[in-house]
Amino acid sequence: MEHAPYHQIQEDLRVPYRSLREAIPDVMTAYHALGTAVMTDGALPATTKELIALACSITRECDGCIVAHARGAARRGVSRQQVAETIGVAINMNGGPATVWGPRALAAYDEFAQSPPEDRALKP
């Protein structure tokens, strides 16, 4: 089955990510633990943290990051309007490049929001 574009980016990164995890397991385990600790509810709800991460992904022009955090936003039940306003913040902070990467983030969110819940789940 052919994947939609952002699902394909996710798939394309899966093997190299596993390879890196095998090469430096301690680093990757620590990185995963950091992400888990950071993205939980605290003074900021996890949904807000996911949107912040999505905005950072846009300003860093990172397709893999956009995929991860657009999927995370969809998984956490963030609305399309919340994603759109987050993109607006990224555009305000990053200017022109965010007008290129922001639409990619919205398209990735749309793709994951329309996919079955099991496609939104994190997979090792």
Predicted ranges, named:
Residues 1-48, 100-124:
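Acidic, glycine/proline-rich low-complexity segments that act as flexible tails and inter-domain linkers
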Residues 28, 68-80, 106:
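Iron-sulfur (Fe-S) cluster-binding segments and ferredoxin-like electron-carrier domains
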Residues 35-36, 53, 70-74, 88:
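Amphipathic alpha-helical segments within well-ordered protein domains
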Residues 42-60, 81-90:
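Immediate flanking context of iron-sulfur cluster ligation sites
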Residues 77-89, 114-124:
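Charge-rich, acidic-biased intrinsically disordered regions
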Residues 84-110:
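C-terminal structural segments of small proteins and small subunits
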